[in-house]
Amino acid sequence: LKPLGYATGQFGKNHFGDKNKYLPTAHGFDEFFGNLYHLNAEEEPENVDYPPEADFPNFKNIFGPRGVLHTWATEEDDPTEHPRWGRVGKQRIEDTGPLTKKRMETADTEFVAAAQDFIKRAHDDDKPFFVWFNTTWMHFRVHPPEHVLGQAGRWQSFYHDVMVEHDKHVG
C-alpha cells in the first residue's frame, strides 16, 4: 500500500517476533505502537517465582520480555546492533516501558489513542491510510481497571465487563 501513497500503521499486539528485523516497521508499516508477546509472558517478571536478580544476574535482560514499543520506518539505515534484538536497520525504535499488570488495565486505551492519532495525521495530510489494530483484551490474563468492573451487569464475570469495554474500543 505504501507505493500507492498510503500511510500504514499497526497498533496493539504483534506476535511475529521480538527481534528488530521482525518489527512491523521493517516490513512495510510506517508506524507501530504495541506489544510483542502474549499477556502472560509480559507479566512473568512480576511473578513471585520469576528468577531474582540476586540469584540470576541479568536474567531479565537476557530472557525477559521487551517493553511496549513505538517504532517508525525511516529512510536512514541505523547500523546499531543490539546483542539480543539485532540490527536496528531502517527504523527508529522507542521502548515505552514494560507491559506490567497495571499497564495492562489501560494498554488497549493507549493503542486506540495512538491509532486515532495516526488516522487524524493521515487525514490532516489528505493521505489515504491503512490501520491494522489488534487489541490485547479478550485474551487470558486480562487485568481490567476498576471503572470497568460491573458494567456487564449482575452475575457477570470481569471477563464480560472487559468485553463491554472492548466493544467500546472497536465499535
Sequence positions of predicted segments:
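Formylglycine-dependent sulfatase
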Residues: 1-171
